[in-house]
């Protein structure tokens, strides 16, 4: 569903997240229009980022990465950080359920 250029951007994003968070990064899931394949050229990249912990400093790093990608590659990353524990505690959350059903694990 994702094209070669989108894959390159997402691979770079995954590498940067792994570099910054190491083992604390559990999973990245692309969801929304780019995962479904009904995006427009201006669509953002909706990414659910699952981490061992989410603190203000973690959110600041994620915001910095998103800003860097906007500057370097002219793409908008809409990053939603969630703790792994939150995901397990909310198995019936409609938003999370939909993100996992339509999503692509990176």
Model regions: which residues?
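Short beta-strand->loop micro-motif that forms the acidic, two-metal-ion catalytic signature
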Residues: 46-49
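Conserved H-loop
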Residues: 33
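Catalytic core of pol beta-like nucleotidyltransferases
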Residues: 1-26, 36-41, 51-106
């Amino acid at each position: 569903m994702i094209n070669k250029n989108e894959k390159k951007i997402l691979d770079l994003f995954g590498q940067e997240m792994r570099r910054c968070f190491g083992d604390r990064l559990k999973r990245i899931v692309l969801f929304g229009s780019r995962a479904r394949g009904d995006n427009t050229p201006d669509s953002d990249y909706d990414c659910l980022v699952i981490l061992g912990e989410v603190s203000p400093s973690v959110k600041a790093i994620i915001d910095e990465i998103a800003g860097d990608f906007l500057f370097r590659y002219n793409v908008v990353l809409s990053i939603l950080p969630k703790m792994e524990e939150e995901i397990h505690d909310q198995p019936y959350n409609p938003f999370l359920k939909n993100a996992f059903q339509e999503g692509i694990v990176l």
